[in-house]
């Protein structure tokens, strides 16, 4: 249930901060939000299967991996189709970029996305661990997005995520109350 509060908070911040851009036809922030919803839907499906079968086994590891990989590849293809993605890997703070072929970049980016999602998912079972690790990462993305020109709205979304996590962490440290 806590995830619903994160979703609501970020969606409200997208609507408030991104309204002007959406009126001008800029939907890139909604793409990111819907991508996150798809991954949340995979997690919900996994939990639903556990409840439905009244056992601790939801989706199999291969089912989860294939769904996550399909979602990551679909997202990357959408971002490329919309012209919001280049095969360049930017190294923050060093003003350096690594140029890759599209195929190498897509494999690398899909690996990073699926790996990150699973890393957070693994830590989510331990009281407060996922949130306490995600807060500094979210703060880093907030600062990075604001530092780079043109990405301020993504910084606001990252800050909204951090705020939601901090509010939830109060109840999620050991012993977790939710």
Regions found by a protein language model. Name each.
Residues 1-178:
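"…together with the soluble PPM/PP2C metallo-phosphatase catalytic core" -> "…together
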């Amino acid at each position: 249930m806590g995830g619903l509060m994160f979703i609501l908070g970020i969606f409200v911040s997208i609507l408030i901060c991104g309204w002007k851009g959406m009126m001008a036809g800029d939907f890139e922030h909604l793409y990111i939000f819907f991508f996150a919803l798809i991954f949340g839907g995979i997690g919900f499906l996994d939990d639903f299967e556990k409840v439905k079968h009244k056992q601790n086994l939801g989706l199999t590891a291969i089912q989860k991996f294939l769904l996550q990989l399909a979602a990551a590849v679909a997202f990357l293809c959408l971002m490329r189709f919309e012209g919001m993605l280049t095969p360049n890997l930017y190294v923050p703070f060093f003003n350096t970029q690594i140029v890759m072929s599209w195929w190498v970049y897509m494999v690398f980016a899909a690996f990073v996305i699926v790996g990150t999602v699973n890393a957070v998912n693994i830590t989510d079972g331990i009281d407060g661990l996922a949130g306490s690790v995600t807060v500094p990462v979210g703060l880093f993305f907030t600062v990075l997005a604001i530092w780079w020109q043109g990405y301020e709205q993504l910084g606001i979304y990252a800050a909204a995520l951090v705020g939601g996590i901090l509010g939830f962490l109060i109840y999620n440290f050991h012993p977790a109350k939710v």
